[in-house]
């Protein structure tokens, strides 16, 4: 099993064995990645998960191999060669192909023919020598159930067809040939409805199977599911027929034509449809896995957007008829005030809306306005921009992706937090908090509702959920969590913690006040020694009695850390000071590691934390663009240079918010002068990028952008 992981991922045997042992000992992936680098050779969370996933697949594969071997052995049909063949397979489907001839079959044409005792005729038909004609031989098999020579011959052919279909050697060859030579074709179904022409490019479409892109596989699948498209695989079986005939028909066999008919029937009725299903399933699985990877990467970048720290924010949930809901939150995310204004039709109380809005901004010293990007967003943005200009308000605004805000607002979490609020009022608070601390707010929402994926509703939902949960867990643990201020929604993603333990932490805080030292955590229900070990490195205790509790240094390394500080003449209160940084920069890591009897990777991490105890990995990402004016599509001209925020990355390019109603598309071919296979190699969600307007379609409200400077 380990060898197959080495072959697939190029990790060393030592690394793989270390990861499997650590996982067996109930260590979490974030804990292993952060605090067991000496054992793993510095593998990150994704690599550790790859080892775990592949190992679990191999365990299940081995279990299935043993089941198959046992079943064949019980039939008395297991040969040493077959056993070796089964054991060497590394794909489940190939094991099933080898097992196929020995499976208990449902009622088929061949099983019926065997029941009618026609198997001897099939064996005779394939034999080298024949003393009588096939018609004479078939005559011997006529009975109550086999009423004619034709029926007997047909039954024998059915048996031969199924034997050919069950041959794993033929299936492997056909699978390979069809994948490399076959063509996927699609056409529009008669009377199918596709009002918006979503699937127009697939009305008469064909592409070699081996070249079809992942996003096209999912588009075709959706079109088929919505009964707009018919999907077929085209494959010329002539060469395969010849190949099988050479294996199955003895030289000078007078029954050649009958066996050829059986071969053609086997291909058309049994093998090709089965292989088509397998290829379709493989293409779909590959495309779904890729879509999940795209969604995961986009979500990771969204979660790790830098927080807007220290700002008083006004969140706005725009709407027409029901009014724009307003909510002010302070720099700590605490709700301060709420209101509702009706600047848009059909109510159109614009003067009153202006008065109330300006009054709220001034009364609460609002520094930033966060506007949701849903219904009436464009009109609200214009309204806010006009007021900033007219009243010379010292504020800027930002457009916030509000996907999932309504899901959160109607959730139990939101009802518990704001029991007396309307759903839209909760949304306004959530929109404001999304800017202030995206990670803390977005963890309250089912990741699938955040909407930064591609065909996310078309993929395996369980696989998607597992992948996205892993992304959220990784992001939360990379950033770290303040144990005294974090919500239970955030705490439950901390390494080692469950939703129940997260609630117990909240209950403890409410009863006892702020936690001051890591040892206090042992008083919390269900937070035992193992849970403490797995979680404490990712929890932060701000203004506690132990300075190291506010760093990512694990308590298991506190002794070494204080030995280091003592050696340099510093104490726990000197963390992050310029003097300490200067001393730390002049150290010989290898010598020091030997002296302190600690691994170099752990020592490097300790020193990073001592230099920057409050380091936040999100600070490395681009900060969002703040605005005080708006653009319309009429303002755009081809060649115009703009700065924008990447909102979504898909296989065919990236959608960039440039401040007009619709996000502009930078096609994959316009991301760089060089060939780009994967847009994610160039851009990520949240990136601030320079773009130029490539083309404008005002009728469709579409803007095409390029990241290639047209003047170069």
Label every model-predicted segment.
Residues 1-17, 24:
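Generic start-of-chain signal for non-secretory N-termini
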Residues 18, 27-42, 352:
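Feature marking long nucleic-acid-engaging regions of large polymerase/nuclease enzymes
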Residues 47-50, 57, 61, 66-315, ...:
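Duplex nucleic acid-engaging cores and interfaces of nucleic-acid transaction enzymes
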Residues 53, 60-77, 87, 416-425, ...:
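Long, highly charged, low-complexity intrinsically disordered interaction regions
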Residues 71, 98, 223-236, 248-271, ...:
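Structured, non-catalytic alpha/beta "coupling" segments that mediate domain-domain communication
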Residues 176-183, 316-320, 375-376, 400-407, ...:
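A glycine-rich phosphate-binding loop feature that marks nucleotide/adenosyl-phosphate handling sites
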Residues 544-545, 549-712:
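Single-stranded RNA-binding regions, centering on S1/OB-family and related RNA-binding modules
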């Amino acid at each position: 099993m380990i060898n197959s992981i080495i072959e697939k991922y190029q990790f060393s045997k030592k690394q793989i064995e270390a990861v499997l042992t650590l996982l067996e000992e109930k260590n979490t992936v974030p804990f292993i990645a952060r605090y067991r680098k000496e054992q793993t050779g510095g593998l990150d969370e994704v690599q550790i998960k790859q080892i775990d996933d592949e190992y679990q697949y191999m365990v299940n594969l081995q279990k299935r191999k043993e089941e198959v071997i046992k079943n064949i052995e019980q039939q008395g049909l297991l040969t040493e060669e077959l056993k070796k063949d089964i054991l060497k397979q590394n794909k489940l489907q190939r094991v099933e192909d080898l097992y196929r001839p020995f499976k208990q079959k449902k009622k088929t044409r061949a099983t019926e023919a065997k029941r009618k005792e026609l198997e001897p005729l099939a064996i005779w038909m394939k034999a080298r020598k024949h003393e009588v004609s096939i018609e004479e031989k078939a005559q011997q098999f006529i009975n109550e159930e086999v009423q004619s020579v034709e029926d007997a011959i047909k039954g024998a052919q059915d048996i031969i067809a199924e034997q050919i279909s069950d041959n794993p050697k033929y299936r492997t060859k056909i699978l390979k040939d069809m994948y490399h030579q076959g063509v996927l074709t699609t056409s529009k179904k008669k009377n199918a409805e596709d009002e918006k022409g979503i699937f127009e490019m697939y009305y008469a479409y064909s592409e070699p199977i081996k070249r079809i892109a992942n996003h096209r596989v999912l588009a075709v699948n959706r079109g088929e599911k919505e009964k707009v498209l018919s999907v077929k695989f085209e494959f010329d079986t002539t060469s395969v027929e010849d190949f099988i005939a050479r294996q199955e028909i003895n030289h000078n066999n007078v029954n050649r034509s009958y066996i050829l008919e059986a071969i053609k029937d086997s291909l058309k009725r049994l093998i090709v449809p089965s292989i088509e299903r397998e290829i379709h399933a493989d293409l779909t699985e590959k495309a779904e896995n890729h879509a999940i990877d795209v969604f995961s990467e986009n979500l990771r970048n969204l979660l790790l957007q830098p927080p807007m720290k220290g700002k008083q924010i006004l969140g706005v949930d725009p709407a027409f008829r029901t009014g724009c809901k307003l909510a002010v939150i302070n720099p700590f995310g605490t709700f301060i005030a709420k209101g509702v204004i009706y600047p848009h039709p059909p109510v159109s109380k614009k003067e009153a809306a202006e008065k109330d809005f300006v009054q709220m901004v001034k009364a609460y010293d609002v520094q930033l306005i966060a506007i949701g990007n849903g219904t009436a967003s464009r009109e609200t943005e214009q309204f806010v921009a006009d007021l900033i200009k007219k009243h010379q308000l010292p504020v800027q605004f930002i457009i916030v992706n509000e996907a999932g805000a309504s899901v959160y607002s109607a959730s139990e979490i939101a009802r518990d937090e704001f029991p007396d609020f309307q759903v839209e009022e909760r949304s306004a608070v959530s929109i404001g908090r999304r800017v202030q601390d995206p990670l803390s707010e977005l963890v309250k929402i089912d990741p699938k509702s955040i909407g930064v994926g591609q065909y996310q509703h078309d993929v395996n939902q369980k696989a998607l959920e597992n992948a996205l949960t892993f992304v959220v867990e990784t992001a939360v643990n990379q950033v770290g969590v303040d144990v005294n201020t974090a919500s239970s929604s955030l705490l439950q993603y901390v390494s080692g913690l469950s939703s129940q333990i997260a609630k117990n932490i909240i209950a403890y805080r409410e009863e006892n006040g702020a936690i001051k030292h890591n040892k206090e955590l042992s008083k919390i229900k269900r937070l035992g020694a193992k849970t403490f070990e797995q979680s404490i490195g990712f929890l932060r205790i701000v203004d506690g009695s132990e300075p190291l509790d506010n760093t990512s240094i694990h308590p298991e390394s506190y002794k070494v850390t204080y030995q280091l500080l003592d050696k340099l003449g510093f104490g726990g209160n000197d963390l992050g000071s310029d003097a300490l940084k200067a001393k730390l920069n002049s150290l010989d890591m290898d010598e020091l590691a030997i002296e302190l009897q600690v691994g170099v990777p752990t020592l490097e991490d300790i020193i990073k934390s001592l230099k920057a105890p409050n380091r936040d990995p999100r600070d490395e990402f681009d900060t969002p663009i703040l605005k005080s004016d708006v653009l319309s599509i009429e303002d755009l001209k081809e060649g115009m240079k703009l700065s924008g925020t990447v909102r979504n990355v898909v296989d065919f390019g990236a959608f960039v918010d440039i401040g007009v109603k619709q996000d502009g598309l930078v096609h994959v071919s316009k991301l760089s002068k060089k060939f780009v296979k994967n847009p994610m190699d160039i851009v990520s969600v949240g990136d601030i990028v320079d773009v130029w307007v490539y083309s404008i379609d005002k009728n469709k409200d579409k803007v095409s952008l390029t990241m290639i400077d047209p003047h170069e």
